[in-house]
Amino acid sequence: MTKKLTTVVEDIYDRIGVLGQGETIDVCDKDLDKFAEFMKQALKDWLTPRTNREPTLRMSNIGKPKRQLWYDMNSKRESQGIPSPVLIKFLYGHILERVVLFLTELAGHKVTDEQKEVKISGILGHMDCKIDGEVVDIKSASGFAFKKFRDGSLPDDDPFGYMAQLAGYEHSEETTDGGFLAINKETGELALFQPDELDKPNIPFKIEELQKIIK
């Protein structure tokens, strides 16, 4: 039976629930090796700092407030670097997101198009993946931020522009029923949030508007 994105959280809970009853889950070596290789690459990437690059519009930032974007693009101040605790947070957040995808596949859902490059009107981005044919952004979140995904209030409080990012990837892929699969870093709880189409911004218009403002 073909799985649907709408049941992914329930299916993950059902699949791993047997562990709590003393039953073993068999996973083939190929899948274990794939997971281990990702962890290895994640550590390599984390241990190699990115060189300073010129600020530019990207799919990951087009949803931020216009004033903030203009300042980010035009500010001449020197970078202060990233604090060590934040670097650690980036690492385990990245690892947790991979754990979520491992569990998704373990539960029988199809994961494709991981880190696929997307380009709209010259704006580049890399989507996290598709699950069962729908664009999905994987998020690791604090308990407070997780509530936005669990109760669906993200469109009303989206300071990082996640909605625009999702809408951009969906526009490129010509899909409409994607969403966010989030994990609570504090409790391990999962939540799937699929926004209504009316809550998503018009991406071609938004990009055109931003490109006029930010030279």
Model-derived segments and spans:
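Metal-dependent nuclease catalytic cores that hydrolyze phosphodiester bonds in DNA/RNA
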Residues: 1-135, 141-153, 160
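Active-site glycine-rich loop that binds ribose-phosphate moieties when present
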Residues: 157-165
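Beta-strand residues in well-ordered beta-sheet regions across diverse protein folds
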Residues: 138-139, 181
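Short Gly/charged-rich anion-binding patches and loops
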Residues: 99, 164-168
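Metal-dependent nuclease catalytic regions and adjoining charged, substrate-binding loops involved
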Residues: 27, 156, 168, 172-215
